[in-house]
Amino acid sequence: MAKLLHLSCSPRPDSESSAGARVFLDGFRQMRPDWDIDVMDLWRERMPEFAGPIVEAKYARMKAEAFDDAQRDSFAEAERMATRLSLAERVLISTPMWNFGIPYKLKQWFDIIVQPGLTFRYDPASGYLPLLKDRPTLVILASGSDFVTGMNRGRTDMATPYLREALRFIGISDVRFVPIGPTTGPADPILAARETAYRRLREIATWF
């Protein structure tokens, strides 16, 4: 069965990014009712802290050294999470922007799955090479203010370039972003931004 992996990155089920994901998935399910939607809620998912054995496992792997038992167990968790990504034909990431970047749980997910031999490899002649096949990926990114006309005009959106580059590093370059913002302040701009995003999400769902 074809699969879409949804990385749900907000701790609030009624958040703007979560609501946008529901709009998209409603349309996606109508177009592809036979697809499996694998939801990975990063605030409820069992994820190892990127410390201790899993860090040592990463460096052992890079040096082609054998794992000890603790490293083997930790690396198995990274394999489990990376496999869920590699088995998905489509990826949806719904996330808020926090302090111009991404939530720490999403960064933790990247830190865990970006492992040598799992999602990238190193070649002395060519440098770092991705191991995942490219696949359509949609990022719904909600922010309190927009970065064109709102309070954050002129400030740097660090979430979008980070996500684009982190995904490209492991092989995923077919990435589209749908921003939702502003999500705070006067009601009219919020409603207008929401409707613009929802309209685009419904359209993307017809062909994604």
UniProtKB/Swiss-Prot annotation:
- What EC number(s) are associated with this protein in UniProt? 1.6.5.-, 1.7.1.17
Q: Which InterPro entries match?
A: Flavodoxin_fold (IPR003680), Flavoprotein-like_sf (IPR029039), FMN-dep_NADH:Q_OxRdtase_AzoR1 (IPR050104), NADH:quinone_OxRdtase_FMN_depd (IPR023048)
- Which GO-annotated molecular functions does the record name? electron transfer activity; FMN binding; oxidoreductase activity, acting on NAD(P)H as acceptor; oxidoreductase activity, acting on NAD(P)H, quinone or similar compound as acceptor
Kindly state which keywords UniProt assigns to this record, in alphabetical order. Answer: Flavoprotein, FMN, NAD, Oxidoreductase
Residues annotated as binding FMN are S10, S15, E16, S17, M97, W98, N99, F100
Which ranges form a coiled coil?
A: none
Domain of life assignment: Bacteria
The record describes how the cofactor is bound as: Binds 1 FMN per subunit.
Q: Which reaction equation describes what this protein catalyses?
A: 2 a quinone + NADH + H(+) = 2 a 1,4-benzosemiquinone + NAD(+); N,N-dimethyl-1,4-phenylenediamine + anthranilate + 2 NAD(+) = 2-(4-dimethylaminophenyl)diazenylbenzoate + 2 NADH + 2 H(+)
Task: Name its co-factor(s).
Answer: FMN
Q: Which family does it belong to?
A: Belongs to the azoreductase type 1 family.
Sum up the protein's function in the record's words.
Answer: Quinone reductase that provides resistance to thiol-specific stress caused by electrophilic quinones.
How the protein assembles, per its UniProt entry? Homodimer.
- Recorded protein name is FMN-dependent NADH:quinone oxidoreductase 1
